[in-house]
Amino acid sequence: MEKISNVYCIEGLMADSNSYLIDNSNDGSDYKYILVDTGTGQSDAFLFSQIREIGIEPEDIDLIVNTHCHFDHVGGNDFFPNAKIAIHKKDAVALRDPDSELTVSSLFGSIVRKHDVDIEFEEGDKIANFEVISTPGHTSGGLSLYDGEILICGDTIFANGGVGRMDIGGNPNDMKSSLMCLKDLDVKYLLPGHGPWVKNGNEHIKMSCMMMGIKY
């Protein structure tokens, strides 16, 4: 497990998303430990072991931020009993009233339990040292978190120019708009929803833009 600034990077197993634990314990905030995405919930023992390696327990997680509503990112939400749930307002309906067409849980042979959503994020909201950026395209309510150097981008962009698929609740035009927004950021570290996290984030954003036919 690698730590970048105050973010611990936890690699997802098999179909699980990556998870990112933001250590906000020195900020004096109500949210000391923030977990970004929880995977499918099918590898909970591994995720717990990684969290305990940091020196905290699952019960210590105060807030879960889901980058979007797909099962491989929200399926483990139930394992953190004291955590509030935050997601973009456009994807909140999928957690409050789960629909397999929105969560794509049927692709994993599972279901998503109904969740309370405590925080509905919008563009420009703040959490810890990060700003919320709306990045639809993979879903209508995709979001990214940016702190001036680190971009936690869910399934919007992957290393080496990949982008999230747009045929399961997404939209290519939304994806292009999101990439147009992200290409203007100064990104030293790109932390995607799957696959490796990488340095020189702008180079990977550039490759994604080129793949989508966007001039960089």
Where are the language model's segments positioned?
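Active-site HxH/HxHxD metal-binding segment of metal-dependent hydrolases
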Residues: G39-E122, M210
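Residue-level marker for buried hydrophobic side chains located in beta-strands
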Residues: I34-V36, V65, I85, I152, ...
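Short, flexible loop segments at the rims of nucleotide/cofactor-binding pockets, characterized by
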Residues: N6-E11, G41, D62-I64, I111, ...
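Short, well-ordered coil/turn elements that cap or connect secondary structure elements
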Residues: E2-I4, F80-N82, I127, D184-L185
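Conserved beta-strand hairpin/beta-sheet module of binuclear metal-dependent hydrolase folds
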Residues: M1-E53, S144-A159
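Glycine-rich phosphate-binding loop signature in dinucleotide/nucleotide-binding domains
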Residues: G28-S29, I54-E59, D125-A128, L185
